[in-house]
């Protein structure tokens, strides 16, 4: 999906700078970090004569490529900065392309003045810009760049100054005021002053809070902090949330295995044919990328399931976490999920060729059925189920559609855990499909019974509970109901003595019993119901306590053992709160859900949207083979991929970052580098599934048409930000003007310099060293509209507003 953002941002740069020390170094943007810190952003790349991986990975970015050693080479309006700091981070894809990096140079300068034109001199060229509170991006303002939830009564942005090698900084003196304004009209919708939150250990930031709870649903908005600059655009609820829910849910579709990815369901014709449908019955032991297929083993055709991540494995973890979350979410919020909601194919022939969509079944159930389908193929006649599928190594070639992968895939061994989990999933899906596909429901119920009969007492208690709940709700079986009662009592006692002990493979226990809580047709035991309610509420309340212990909504305890993706797994932490809100409608629970889900949309120390295709500071290099293919075609990356994010350091550091990454706090330990698997890979079960179901609930089930970008607006003029001098030391006439305008000093004062700015503050014409009392300016080549003249005479600078007409 191509994010066509047309809002106009004031970045007035001379991109073709002269005198570059390195031909690959480009001046990209001017920002602020504070009222007296300017951020000059450069990008660089190294084009290698070879695509050899070893050569490529060992080629290092020069952190001193931007020349900061001599302060005299930098000037702002002729004044040298008092101090220079830097942050350098690599941003590379694969060894078939260049090594890339971003250099952010922090210049300590005099206090910036609203409406002032500045000339910046650097060792790599000069540029001119205008600083205004509403148009200069301040990177210290951290917001959800996509959609704050309209369901929440609490929302916020954070403000934190971080200067790379200069570290975290506090604001000196009185805390600044801010306002929130609609960027299309300029209307202020909320205002206040920054609130001191204090030092945050997890991020290393000294944090200030910007209250957004009074901002109404709508947008796009920006936050303007007086003297500092403005935030990136953001929206609240409405189309903003709807688009976020749509993109997030469809991330599951883009990871499907055994299906083409083509228009009109994909944004381009990515994968023309089915992939990975030929499976060899190897029955190999579990192991990472270590399954050898000879090619003489018995083979069969399969469909369904998902590619695990940047590879094409289909693993037990998908079965444990994906179908139960999809189906439980639907049962908790059936009003928010419908058919034709997410533009996914749901009509197929017997060989799973796509016939269309609109089968009358909610899309979320269709997705659960696709997630379950592969496990039906992996079930043997005796009821047992394989652990998954695997190959030797990873899909090859690298940047390809998955239907071009030439590797052979085989089955992994029969597994009791897979069989026990499949029993519950098959029974759950049988129950949900019964009103729509009764014959299919019967088949799934039979599969469930065979799986449970095979695994017997080798199933764990969570799987027993899941199966028993679903069997009782589907059939009314008395024995199954008694199992529900007995197991719930067992778990309730365990939770009293050891909170959280009943969780299973990152699934909270409530996923397995929640349908029993809300059952309306079968009789339920109210003692059991209360025990279930207590377990769920206690789980949700623990997450609220953790949420409140950090300045950013990271939700992940400091004590958590490092694992891939644990600092972007806000969905896992939010999910029990979501279920509790679904049950009780207590506002505090949906407030915490909403705020936790702001983190990976940009409300984090780096200000990065960790989800591809969303936000304004996006992930460019997810470790995803098909995304590298779509990038090579000029289509951008597959949207909706939530990468693993910060805090998961590899044993070997093979990328460039300054300050050194081990010295950074956990929430800043991230590099946008495709080969940092622990940071830029992802999985269907760890990072994608929870956003896929939570964001549509936060959007209240609204349907997005897939084309209307709510950020596709024209920004309000900056003219209101520039103080226009109405005194008559300088005259301009005629005004309005058709052809030529005269600028004259009424006091015979020499005009020294002249700048013509358009309505967005861009310098469209400039002339220096005039030294005349009168000058004529030809306006014939300029389009109609409002302009600002900045006229500098010996008496000082004057701003004049003028109108160009036909």
Q: What residue spans do the PLM features occupy?
A:
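Aromatic (Trp/Tyr) and acidic
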Residues: 25-80, 91-105, 146-147, 153-227, ...
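Surface-exposed, short loops/turns at beta-strand junctions within beta-sandwich domains
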Residues: 108-115, 213-219, 780-784
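Edge beta-strands of extracellular beta-sandwich domains
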Residues: 125-133, 230-237, 798-803
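Low-complexity, Pro/Ser/Thr- and charge-rich linker/hinge segments at domain boundaries
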Residues: 132-154, 231-269
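Residue-level detector of functionally pivotal "anchor" positions at catalytic/ligand-binding pockets or at interdomain
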Residues: 134, 705-733, 747-748
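C-terminal outer-membrane/trafficking sorting elements
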Residues: 184, 723-806
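Acidic, glycine-anchored loop motifs typical of Ca2+
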Residues: 343-364, 736
């Amino acid at each position: 999906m191509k994010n066509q953002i047309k809002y106009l941002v004031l970045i007035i740069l001379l991109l073709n700078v002269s005198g570059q020390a390195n031909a690959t170094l480009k001046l990209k943007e001017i920002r602020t970090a504070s009222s007296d810190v300017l951020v000059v952003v450069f990008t660089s790349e190294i084009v290698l004569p070879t695509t050899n991986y070893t050569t490529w990975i060992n080629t290092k970015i020069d952190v001193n490529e931007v020349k900061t050693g001599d302060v005299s080479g930098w000037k702002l309006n002729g004044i040298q900065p008092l101090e220079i700091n830097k942050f350098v981070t690599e941003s590379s894809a694969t060894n078939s392309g260049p090594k890339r990096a971003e250099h952010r140079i922090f210049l300590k300068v005099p206090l910036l003045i609203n409406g002032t034109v500045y000339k910046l001199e650097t060792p790599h060229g000069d540029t001119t810009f205008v600083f205004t509170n509403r148009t200069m991006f301040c990177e210290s303002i951290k917001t959800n760049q996509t959609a704050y939830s309209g369901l929440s009564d609490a929302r916020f942005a954070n403000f934190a100054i971080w200067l790379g090698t200069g570290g975290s900084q506090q604001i000196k003196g009185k805390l600044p005021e801010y306002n929130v304004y609609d960027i299309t009209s300029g209307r202020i919708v909320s205002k206040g002053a920054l609130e001191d939150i204090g030092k945050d250990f997890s991020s290393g930031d000294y944090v200030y809070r910007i209250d957004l709870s009074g901002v109404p649903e709508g947008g796009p908005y920006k936050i303007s902090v007086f003297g500092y600059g403005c935030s990136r655009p953001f929206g609240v609820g409405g189309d903003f949330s709807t688009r976020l829910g749509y993109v997030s849910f469809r991330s599951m579709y883009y990871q499907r295995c055994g299906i083409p990815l083509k228009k009109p369901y994909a944004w381009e014709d990515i994968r023309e044919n089915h992939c990975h449908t030929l499976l060899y019955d190897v029955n190999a032991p579990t192991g990472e990328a270590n399954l050898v297929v000879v090619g003489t083993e018995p083979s069969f055709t399969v469909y369904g399931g998902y590619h695990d991540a940047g590879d094409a494995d289909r693993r037990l973890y998908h079965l444990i976490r994906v179908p139960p979350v999809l189906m439980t979410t639907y049962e908790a919020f059936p009003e928010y999920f419908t058919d034709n909601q997410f533009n996914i194919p749901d009509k197929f022939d017997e060989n799973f060729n796509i016939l269309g969509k609109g089968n009358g079944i909610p899309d979320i159930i269709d997705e659960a059925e696709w997630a379950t389908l592969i496990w039906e193929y992996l079930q043997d006649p005796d009821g047992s189920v394989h652990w998954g599928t695997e190959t030797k190594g990873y899909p090859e070639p690298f940047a390809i559609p998955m239907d071009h992968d030439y590797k052979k895939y085989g089955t992994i061994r029969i597994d009791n855990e897979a069989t026990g989990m499949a029993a519950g999933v098959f029974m759950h899906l049988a129950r949900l499909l019964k009103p729509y596909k009764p014959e299919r429901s019967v088949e799934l119920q039979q599969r469930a019974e065979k799986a449970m009969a095979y695994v017997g007492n080798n199933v764990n208690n969570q799987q027993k509970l899941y199966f028993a709940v679903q069997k009782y709700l589907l059939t009314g079986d008395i024995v199954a109901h008694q199992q529900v009662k007995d197991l719930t009592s067992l778990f309730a006692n365990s939770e009293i003595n050891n909170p959280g002990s009943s969780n299973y493979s990152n699934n909270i226990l409530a996923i397995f019993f929640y349908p029993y809580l809300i059952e309306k047709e079968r009789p339920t035991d109210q003692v059991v119901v209360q025990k279930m309610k207590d377990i769920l509420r206690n789980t949700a309340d623990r997450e609220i306590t953790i949420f409140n212990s950090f300045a950013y909504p990271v939700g992940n305890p400091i004590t958590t053992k490092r694992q891939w993706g644990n600092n972007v797994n806000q969905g896992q932490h939010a999910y029990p709160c979501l279920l509790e809100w679904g049950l009780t409608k207590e506002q505090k629970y949906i407030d915490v859900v909403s705020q936790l889900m702001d983190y990976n949309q940009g409300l984090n120390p780096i200000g990065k949207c960790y989800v591809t295709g969303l936000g304004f500071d996006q992930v460019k290099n997810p470790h995803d083979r098909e995304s590298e293919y779509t990038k090579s075609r000029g289509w951008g990356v597959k949207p909706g991929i939530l990468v693993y994010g910060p805090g998961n350091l590899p044993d070997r550091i093979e990328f460039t970052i300054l300050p050194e990454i081990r010295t950074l706090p956990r929430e800043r330990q991230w590099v946008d580098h495709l080969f940092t698997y622990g940071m830029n890979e992802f999985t269907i079960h760890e990072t994608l599934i929870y956003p896929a179901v939570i964001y549509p609930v936060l959007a209240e089930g609204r349907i997005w048409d897939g084309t209307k970008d709510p950020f596709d607006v024209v920004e309000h003029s900056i003219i209101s930000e520039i103080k226009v001098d109405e005194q008559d030391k300088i005259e301009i006439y005629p005004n309005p003007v058709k052809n030529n305008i005269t600028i004259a000093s009424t006091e015979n004062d020499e005009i020294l310099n002249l700048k013509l700015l358009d309505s967005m503050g861009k310098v469209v014409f400039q002339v220096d060293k005039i030294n005349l009392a009168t000058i004529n300016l030809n306006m014939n080549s300029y389009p109609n509209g409002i302009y600002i003249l900045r006229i500098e005479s010996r008496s000082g600078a004057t701003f004049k507003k003028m109108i160009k007409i036909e």
